Amino acid sequence: MVHLSGDEKNAVHGLWSKVKVDEVGGEALGRLLVVYPWTRRFFESFGDLSTADAVMNNPKVKAHGSKVLNSFGDGLNHLDNLKGTYAKLSELHCDKLHVDPENFRLLGNVLVVVLARHFGKEFTPDLQAAYQKVVAGVANALAHRYH
């Protein structure tokens, strides 16, 4: 569960309505793979991930990033039940993919960086604080199966 004030919820949803999921999702996942290269091991089937340019222009990275961000958007509609919303994804990432749950936190932080880059001054410190709460809640929900 993420505790946001009414103003924070409105701000988070207001900005989210402007997010170009394909663009932001691909960039966020791409940056995760570049900044934290050990995360690439989960995406070996995506082809060439040998350089930053290869990662950022990889169509499979872009497509999966979009999928990830669509799932994040679903979570925004269920902030009071993130664990339930992400239960199946948590199980998949824990039991089948064996993803280190720390990677969820890293991706959340990268997403905040990408949102700041895309929205500039509109992404105020208060809005960043609200999004940090949300990405922490999502990361916690995705890591739930690990506990």
Swiss-Prot record:
Gene Ontology molecular function, alphabetical: haptoglobin binding; heme binding; hemoglobin alpha binding; metal ion binding; organic acid binding; oxygen binding; oxygen carrier activity; peroxidase activity
One GO CC term, this protein: blood microparticle
Keywords: Acetylation, Heme, Iron, Metal-binding, Oxygen transport, Phosphoprotein, S-nitrosylation, Transport
Modified sites of kind Phosphoserine: S45
Residue positions, PTM N-acetylvaline: V2
Pfam families: Globin (PF00042)
UniProt tissue specificity: Red blood cells.
InterPro entries: Globin (IPR000971), Globin-like_sf (IPR009050), Globin/Proto (IPR012292), Hemoglobin_b (IPR002337), Hemoglobin_oxygen_transport (IPR050056)
GO BP terms: hydrogen peroxide catabolic process
Residue intervals of the Globin domain: 3-147
Keyword Ubl conjugation: no
Binding site for heme b: H64, H93
Residues carrying N6-acetyllysine: K60, K83
Positions of modified residues (S-nitrosocysteine): C94
Described purpose of this protein according to its UniProt entry: Involved in oxygen transport from the lung to the various peripheral tissues.
Oligomer status and interactors: Heterotetramer of two alpha chains and two beta chains.
Family recorded in the similarity comment: Belongs to the globin family.
Protein name: Hemoglobin subunit beta
This protein's encoding gene: HBB
